[in-house]
Amino acid sequence: WSSDVCSSDLFDKSRNLYGLNFARSSRKKEIILCEGYMDVISMHQAGFTNAVAALGTAFTSGHGTLLKRYTENVILSFDSDEAGQRAILRAIPILKEEGLTVRVLDLTPYKDPDEFIKGLGAQALEERIRKAMSSFMFQVKVAAGRYDQDDPESKTQFQHEAAKLLAT
């Protein structure tokens, strides 16, 4: 079985989530959405059976609809690199459109859940999950990083962007 499998009439990658068969019967109130299936395997081995991932494809509205059937709360646990952060920013509006409450897990200084668990352990990850930031605060944090807060004009541009985020 490969994540490179194409979608067909019988199988649609944009409407399936790896690990959902376990996550939907988890006793947790939220589902943790990971970037890839290897992250899900690591999470499950560490006891986080509420972790899922898109199957080798970008996160879609079909995935959002599927998650909505099983939870009201999603925690995004994507890689802490730039690509992972961009993927989080793309996933947030899809999940919000479904009416889901979205929080973002901070894995720094580690790249992904597997490295985090190996470095600090499952208990430390549980604590990070408990303290996961709201999607709005994550978006504001990312936006703030794009502006020079010491420059008045740049700071004003950031404030306008933050106001737009608040209005959505």
Question: What are these language model-derived features?
Answer:
Residues 1-2, 76, 133-134:
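Intrinsically disordered, low-complexity segments enriched in Ser/Pro/Gly/Ala and basic residues
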Residues 4, 9-12, 39, 79-81, ...:
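Acidic-enriched, low-complexity/disordered segments with a strong bias for Aspartate over Glutamate
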Residues 101-168:
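C-terminal or mid-to-C-terminal helical accessory/interaction module adjacent to the motor/catalytic core
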Residues 3-70, 74, 87-88:
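Phosphate-handling DNA/RNA-contact segment within nucleic-acid enzymes
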Residues 40, 92, 163:
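Short glycine-/small-residue-rich flexible loop motifs, especially phosphate/cofactor-binding loops
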Residues 25, 57-109, 116-125, 129:
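Conserved catalytic cores of soluble enzyme domains
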